[in-house]
Amino acid sequence: MKLEDFGPFVIFTALYAAGTLGLPEIHLFAYQVKVGEIPSAFVAIFGYPAVFGLTLGQFIANLGVEASPIAMLSPAVSFIGLAVIYRLRKVSVLAGSVAYIILTSTWLTYLLPITSGISTSTAASSAFLGQTIAVLIGYGGYAVASRIRASVAATPEGQQTTQ
């Protein structure tokens, strides 16, 4: 990473950690919908600084919430999913986001019965719905941001006035 990547890295780390630890919990069955998952689609714009930032943010949030050894593997799974979103950005950010949902939901389906003692079917439905809600909210934000970004890029510099 270059020096100019440090800003987005810190911002995405803070978004995940503060969003998960600082905001009220949103429960969906047995799973907590993590606000920190919302900016996952933005890795298509901000690249690996966002991938590393969200991964570190998840690690920090897990230290504050569920510090079990198995739960500490979650950032590695998340990193792989975020890297998939980044790699698929030129093909389809939505496809990358769906792959992220499937990967992380599968991991959470395995993790929740171990850490919470709930049934696998409840874990699967809770994790899938929770991840889908959070990631698709983020995808909506990404879609708006990318359209604004495209319209700003299409504006000739000569038409911009400063007053």
Summary of predicted features, one role per range:
Residues 1-52:
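Hydrophobic transmembrane alpha-helices
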Residues 21-34, 38, 59-163:
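Membrane-embedded alpha-helical hairpins and interfacial helices in multi-pass inner-membrane proteins
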Residues 44-57, 65-71:
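Interfacial helix-start motif at the membrane-water boundary
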